Amino acid sequence: MTDLTSLTLAEARDGLANKSFTAVELTDAHLAAIEAARVLNAYVLETPDQARQMAKAADAQIAKGEGGPLAGLPLGIKDLFATKGERTTACSKILGDFKPTYESTVTTQLWRDGAVLLGKLNNDEFAMGSSNETSCFGPVINPWRRAGSDAKLVPGGSSGGSAAAVAAGLCLGATATDTGGSIRQPAAFTGTVGIKPTYGRCSRWGIVAFASSLDQAGPIARTVRDSAILLRSMAGHDPKDTTSVDRPVPNYEAAVGGSVKGMKIGIPKEYRLDGMPAEIEKLWSQGAEWLKAAGAELVEVSLPHTKYALPAYYIVAPAEASSNLARYDGVRYGARVNGRNIIEMYENTRAAGFGAEVKRRIMIGTYVLSAGYYDAYYLRAQKVRTLIKRDFEQCFDQGVSAILTPATPSAAFGIGEKGGADPVEMYLNDIFTVTVNMAGLPGIAVPAGSDSQGLPLGLQLIGRPFDEDTLFSLGEVIEQAAGRFTPAKWWA
């Protein structure tokens, strides 16, 4: 029998429909894989009993011909999504053993469609990080290794657990969130596909907030088709989220394999950075050639304010975070460290509960929002954000269907290798991805090649607002040309 954990989500769906195996068998195979791969530290909470119950219920639905679009398909959930009665911590000590009394909208929709919960996935604390090294549960280890080396590599972040679990066959797909690249960068580092939908496409209700005007949920999966299937279930209007957009959710899967003939693909000259590795440059050109061969037209475009995106992002995001994280004070939920009075209790709780990177961003955010600096920093960053958005609008107004860029400036790096003395070194990982969040656009990362050491590299496609369909069509062209990327199993 085929190894059930090596199937794509679409293949598993077809296998269940054909009665080749049951949802319980599929779930058990994934639970065994999770157990054998604990060294990767991808899961921070395993829910085997609940998984088997949900799988059993899915089998009953499938037998009656009433299974939903995701019936019996086992998924991992990033620990930023509230799961009713199951520990949700955002991988921070300050939330302790918090068990929500409610379910996030995105996960509610996944369970409505019959999906199975395998457990909660590791992430950077409060989604603040690009390497999954800031989690209070410890770092996630990338299932990929450099050729001839057993050095531990990061899976990217903040959705490192989601990307590692999908790459290692520990779930058929995973939920993730993206504030400045947290879906696309880990997908690129692990040879998986990750899409950040348009801002407002997926509800943020029940997701632990980092930066509310930038956060967006999306899937990480093994293929473009799988990510399209998952996004259809995750997306939709939610009156509980005031930023949720009320427009119909298309059948994204129908766009996979769609013709790209005649589409104009923008190649932004500002993304050609000084010191960009030759491998990334070559991959980018190769991706453009693949799209051209499929009938797309390549045009050079200009996004002149790109160079200001990263500094503006690292003002806006920490400012919103400092406001959002003010709610963690030890009073009503989460961990508490007592003091002689309430102020001291707040201080002690936050000092003990937040990790170093979260404290750094809260302090940056509080600083840029303070009376003397608000105009100079925060207001100016918001004006820059408007200019970045306008750059993209002008580009799309010229008939460009999508923009092709690298997803990351490098392949996965070693654990402990970056950001020790200089956090900016780590922040530079987001250089190709933050513009998309600042403009609220959809962006997909698709694995497109390998570096000289055999590590996967990804390309990014940026689309018009609510035109995820085009990204799925173009992404599939790259996927077909580049092939699949699967790490050699060293952990079991």
Swiss-Prot record:
Its EC number is 6.3.5.7. The keyword Magnesium does not apply. One of its GO terms (biological process) is translation. It comes from the Bacteria. It catalyses: L-glutamyl-tRNA(Gln) + L-glutamine + ATP + H2O = L-glutaminyl-tRNA(Gln) + L-glutamate + ADP + phosphate + H(+). Keywords: ATP-binding, Ligase, Nucleotide-binding, Protein biosynthesis. The keyword ATP-binding applies. GO terms for cellular component: glutamyl-tRNA(Gln) amidotransferase complex. The active site is at residues 78, 158, 182. GO terms for molecular function: ATP binding; glutaminyl-tRNA synthase (glutamine-hydrolyzing) activity. HAMAP family: GatA (MF_00120). Belongs to the amidase family. GatA subfamily. This is Glutamyl-tRNA(Gln) amidotransferase subunit A. It comes from Rhodopseudomonas palustris (strain TIE-1). The lineage of its organism: Bacteria, Pseudomonadati, Pseudomonadota, Alphaproteobacteria, Hyphomicrobiales.
